[in-house]
Each structure stands twice: as structure tokens, then as C-alpha cells.
Curated annotation (Swiss-Prot):
EC number: 6.3.1.13
Motif 'KMSKS' region positions after renumbering to this chain: 281-285
Residues annotated to bind Zn(2+): 35, 223, 248
Cross-referenced InterPro entries: Cys-tRNA/MSH_ligase, Mycothiol_ligase_MshC, Rossmann-like_a/b/a_fold, tRNA-synt_1_cat_dom
Keyword terms, alphabetized: ATP-binding, Ligase, Metal-binding, Nucleotide-binding, Zinc
Name the record gives this protein: L-cysteine:1D-myo-inositol 2-amino-2-deoxy-alpha-D-glucopyranoside ligase
UniProt cross-references to HAMAP family, sorted A to Z: MshC
GO CC, any one term: cytosol
Subunit composition and interactions: Monomer.
Gene Ontology MF term list: ATP binding; cysteine-glucosaminylinositol ligase activity; cysteine-tRNA ligase activity; zinc ion binding
Organism lineage: Bacteria, Bacillati, Actinomycetota, Actinomycetes, Micromonosporales
Binding site for L-cysteinyl-5'-AMP: 35-38, 50, 73-75, 219, 241-243, 275
Origin species: Salinispora tropica (strain ATCC BAA-916 / DSM 44818 / JCM 13857 / NBRC 105044 / CNB-440)
Keyword Disulfide bond found: no
């Protein structure tokens, strides 16, 4: 990330728990945990948009003089991964490694600053099992009496359950089964209780769990434990797509808060909107996913993809289409022509505007408009500052992650 003159200001971010914008004010080091992929398929544009959002946070923090400790998990053991491997007759470990490698290649192409720590769920299982046992001993978790060895979290153990998502119980019950929950599981104390530990099953991978018995962890506890181990009891940002607000982030925060006794787990719960295709929701079931690797193979400039995804505000659901990409390609071309001019209007005002827009809840559309204004002026011969094109180029690289 290139150094820029001066420093940016504090970053305001929308927090799902507050349902409003507040300053993210880390002192010295900003800590961020972002839920990564389940590596059974290639990186689609929804993944890319989410990762660009948190890349912008990291860039704005660093520009403000902060160090950043950024952790991202890889859910390298989960039912969808096992199901895809079985369908394709492939070893699940090989599938996970291949798709994780492709994801990282896609992120590099999009100029995402990598996390300081990429952590797989599998490597974290011993720590996760230990924390699940702690919850059992504290009375916040229980083992089913059906002989499966399955352990569930008791949501009644935390009176704060629901503070992040602000959903009614009826809404939770509707969403829970759509996002991996099992409200109809016999023997649970509450239909919304999430799985902490799945006891070993025939033909499924499992790991030693000490007093839990062999098995594998549930999804929510994986993220809670990885974040606690690497970032501590409280973090500045927990992030992901807005489909993770409930149950995933609600449950992982509940787990972490019960384990540490500190609230809130995250000072900001930040969620990126979903990406649709031509006005329809983009999903695996619809078969309309657009993959970053496919665009790259079609010789689409990754910087144009990045620009297209930043042309809408991160917090909003938005749509991808050919027109959006074409507009981004034209914008990128104009910026490159402007940056190649021998001189231009002073870029200091542009840098201040760029910083100001990004500090206001990552207003990337406003940031792009500021860059457009400078480029248009430069292209018609306004200004005679020979250093301006270089500063323009460096600012776009550092703050927007766009290399001209």
C-alpha cells in the first residue's frame, strides 16, 4: 500500500447492532475478523464484493496511521464441502485445498491486502473442542441424550441473544433452517439452539474431542474460537455478508461473550450487501453465479471488476450486469488516460475528498465520483501541476486498491 502525504481521519461505520453509524476508533491497532469461504466452489462476485468491503476498511485504517491485525477463517470442514466432494467423487481435502488456492489467487488479482492470519477450521479443532467443553461445564451447552454425541449451545444462557440481528423469534425461526440451522432436531431445549459439536458419524471425517468424544465442530463456534485466540476477547470489527447476521454472527458473538464474560464481542458488526445478477438474486441453486476466475479467464481486467463492485455502496444489495462492467471498464480507461497526462490540477484536494468519502462509512460511489472529477479536469487540460498525476495514481492505489 503506497504511502500518501498526511493522514486520513477516523472511520465511521454502520454497525448492525446499533442500527446506525458510529466511529470505529481503535487505538494503535485495529482488529478485524471476517468470515471466509467454505471452499467447495470458486470465488463468486458476492465473495469478491464482501472482501473488497473489508479491504477498504483495512486501507482506511492504515492510511489513518493504524496497524491492523486482520484474521480470516476458511471453513475447510462443513456439510456443503463434504456433499460436493461426495457428488464429484473427490477427496474433500483435495477439493478444499484447490478451491482455497483459487480463492487466494482471485483475491490477489483483485488487489485485496491479505489478512495477517488465514486460519482453517480443521487446524483449530483442538482449541474449539476445549472451548465447547468450557461451555458445557458452565451450563451454557448440553449434550443430546440420543447417543449421537451432539452438543448444542443453550441460547437461554445469554439474555443478550438477538441484540445484533434485532430479529423477532418468529423471524429467527423462519431464517434458521434456511442458513444451516436445525430447529426440528429432537431433544433440543430450544429450536434455535445451534450446534457446537457434531459427534462422529460413519463415513464422515471426525477428530478427537477429549471428553466430548470424537466429532467435528459446528460453524459458529469455529469463528468465535479463532477470533478469540488471535484477536482477544473484544474486537473492533466482525464482518461478512449480510446473510451472516443471523444465525452465524449472532451465535458466534453469543459463544464468545459466554466464554469471556465481556460484551460486546465486536464493537462494530459490519455487513456487506448481496450481489444479484440482472436483478435476480445470485445463488448456487439458481445456477447464476458469476465467478471471478471465469471473468479473469475471459481477459476481463480485475481492476474493472473491482471498480464495478465499488460503484454501489457496500451496505446495499445491488445487481451485477454487463452494463455495470462496461461502465467500469470505461471509467478505468479514463482514469488511466488522465494519469498519463504530463500535468493536471492539484491532486491534494482530490486526496482530501477521497479520504473524506471513504471515512464516511466507505462511501465508494462518492470516492469514485471524486476521482472522475479530477480525471475529467486533467483530460481537458485543467491545471499545470506535474506532480498531480502521480499523486492521483498513488491515492487510487492506496485507498481504493485500484492500480492504473
Amino acid at each position: 500500500m503506497p504511502r500518501l502525504p498526511g493522514r486520513g481521519g477516523p472511520l465511521m461505520l454502520f454497525d448492525s447492532a446499533r442500527r446506525g453509524t458510529a466511529a470505529s476508533a481503535p487505538t494503535g491497532t485495529g482488529t478485524m475478523y471476517v468470515c471466509g469461504i467454505t471452499p467447495y466452489d470458486a470465488t463468486h462476485l458476492g465473495h469478491a464484493a464482501t472482501m473488497i468491503t473489508f479491504d477498504l476498511i483495512q486501507r482506511v485504517w492504515r492510511d489513518a496511521g493504524l496497524d491492523v491485525t486482520y484474521v480470516q477463517n476458511v471453513t475447510d470442514i462443513d456439510d456443503p464441502l463434504l456433499e460436493r466432494a461426495a457428488r464429484d467423487g473427490e477427496d474433500w481435502k483435495v477439493l478444499a485445498m484447490r478451491e482455497t488456492a483459487l480463492f487466494r489467487e482471485d483475491m490477489e488479482a483483485l488487489r485485496i491486502i491479505p489478512p495477517e492470519h488465514y486460519v482453517g477450521a480443521v487446524e483449530s479443532i483442538p482449541d474449539i473442542a476445549e472451548r465447547v467443553l468450557m461451555l458445557v461445564k458452565e451450563g451454557a451447552a448440553y449434550r443430546l441424550e440420543d447417543g449421537t454425541g451432539d452438543v448444542y449451545f443453550d441460547i437461554s444462557a445469554t439474555p443478550r441473544f438477538g441484540y445484533e440481528s434485532h430479529l423477532s423469534r418468529e423471524q429467527m425461526l423462519e431464517i434458521f433452517p434456511e442458513r444451516g440451522g436445525d430447529p426440528d432436531r429432537a431433544g433440543k431445549r430450544d429450536p434455535l439452539d445451534p450446534l457446537l459439536w457434531r459427534g462422529a458419524r460413519a463415513d464422515e471425517p471426525s477428530w478427537p474431542g477429549g471428553d466430548l468424544g470424537p466429532g467435528r465442530p459446528g460453524w459458529h463456534i469455529e469463528c468465535a474460537v479463532i477470533a478469540l485466540n488471535l484477536l482477544g476477547a473484544q474486537i473492533d470489527v466482525q464482518g461478512g455478508g449480510n446473510d451472516l447476521i443471523f444465525p452465524h454472527h449472532e451465535c458466534s458473538a453469543a459463544h464468545a461473550e459466554l466464554l469471556t464474560g465481556q460484551t460486546p464481542f465486536a464493537r462494530h458488526y459490519v455487513h456487506a450487501g448481496m450481489i444479484g445478477l440482472d436483478g435476480e438474486k445470485m445463488s448456487k441453486s439458481r445456477g447464476n453465479l458469476v465467478f471471478v476466475s471465469r471473468l479473469r479467464a475471459d481477459q476481463v481486467d480485475p481492476m474493472a471488476v473491482r471498480l464495478a463492485l465499488m460503484s454501489g455502496h457496500y451496505h446495499s444489495d445491488r445487481s451485477w450486469n454487463d452494463e455495470l462492467l462496461a461502465t467500469a471498464q470505461k471509467r478505468l480507461g479514463r482514469w488511466r488516460k488522465a494519469a498519463a497526462m504530463p500535468c493536471g490540477p492539484s491532486a491534494e484536494a482530490f486526496l482530501a475528498a477521497l479520504r473524506g468519502r471513504l471515512a464516511d462509512d466507505l462511501d465508494s460511489p462518492g470516492a469514485l465520483a471524486a476521482a472522475d472529477s479530477w480525471a475529467e479536469a486533467a483530460l481537458v487540460g485543467v491545471g499545470d501541476d506535474p506532480a498531480a498525476p502521480t499523486l492521483f495514481t498513488r491515492a487510487l492505489d492506496a485507498l481504493l486498491g485500484v492500480r492504473l
